[in-house]
Amino acid sequence: MQGYGGTFIRWLAMKSYEPYNSWGNGSAMRVSSVGCFFQTLERTREVARWSAEVTHNHPEGVKGAEAVASVIWMARKGFSKEEIKTYVEKEFGYDLSKSCDEIRPEYYFDVSCQGTVPQAITAFLEGTDFEDVIRTAVSLGGDCDTLTCIAGGMAEAFYGVPDFLKEKCLEFTTREMHEVMERFEKGKLEIER
């Protein structure tokens, strides 16, 4: 089962379908849309927690998802990068003091939230536009597709995605996926559920 972690594969074979206490970065990688829908930061964090707990109910898995959704919510609401950084450091205890240039030489492949989320946030904080954030996240190496997914969600909320990149991405997606993306964009209004 390519693309799935060993813990998930073992979980599939179990008779119980309870969450498996994962601290992996999958919870943070998939949570970006949660940062787009809710009116309050509190509600955003609550739904991010629920999203994580389905599979990643370890405190680090939950924290990673909440941190990512919080950054996206704050970026959408017009908070500055400095305000976002301060909030993340205070609320989640992530050390965001190292620059990407300091992270890069000692960074390695790490599938944990604590080894991915702060680095993705740092790439977002250092980037100057959407594309720069993406390039910076990729340049860190490690689990760079996940890093880039997380940082990209933050960059989209803060900068938007340039039209030329949207158009290029559409060339590689199916018509069905175009329809999903259009519905998402139209539904990107704040909701309460």
Where do the model's predicted regions map?
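Structured, active/binding-site neighborhoods that engage oxygen-rich ligands
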Residues: 1-193
